[in-house]
């Protein structure tokens, strides 16, 4: 049974957009529950991207011929679509290769611009993906700023109390950099409360998991920077975006140097191009950016509110059904802040074995491992009632999933438990 957001006819059209859902894996219908790692790709988006490459492609911004003009127009139109999608200005949107590049570029630029310097404090949470953890840790060792943490409880949940405790320990952080939604626990963070609590800090949001299913308004949230990836919202790999308030982007040193990002170059000095081009050195992933624009068109044609409600419905069902299994330990909150994914373990069975059996015997794609969040695994181990293996199984849904997919997962987990005793 699909989400009640779609009629049977509408859902049939959705399934037709993703041909891989019609294939079999090990003799079973594919049940794709690894959307937090990457989503499936839309036939419409791929078709339009192919047409762009075959009939309209050229390098951009550099020539006056027709193909260059067409390609540049498509590229800049995609930027405008991204800006509209998050309620920003187009000059505040910088194309990147994805969230990891966006955060790394931003961290390096903040440090090199002197906006984060020796003696400053950067506040992040204990549930961060390595992409929002490692850059801060490493650069703090070279530039002398401190990294402090909003602590998670033993379920991996960031609570209001933990945010307030961090406020009492770190009264005036220069930067607060936090995920919008944990890729391990599925918790959607209270961004508004964090903004209100740390009014004067530069607020950076890792939107990789959140933006595929929840509308983000950067102006309403008053975030300073937002990064996200296209491949987690059915766009191709290798494309993402960095949003920054124009007043802050103007102050930042570019993170890449080369062609197109300059205004004037002499043998002695350089002046930079205007926003956002001073951050887009060299030839960009033109086709990827254009495809990201097509992706936004497709998602908006479905109604993003419908997608959001669909994910909420599937998430609730996933959490409810897994909670009925007494041999399954679930991590993260058990309320409505738990969205789109669930990380869990089967008592007595290693996560890799669980995922392998689900794939081989049921055609279910899940993720097992530490999910690029090794420090969080040590937090979860403290509160675990089982012999915690420093990794988990993760099942994650998107709008093309069904309740039947979740039912098959539950049956698969019962089989796993019987098989391993």
Q: Residues of each region from the PLM?
A:
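Pyridoxal 5′-phosphate
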Residues: 1-421
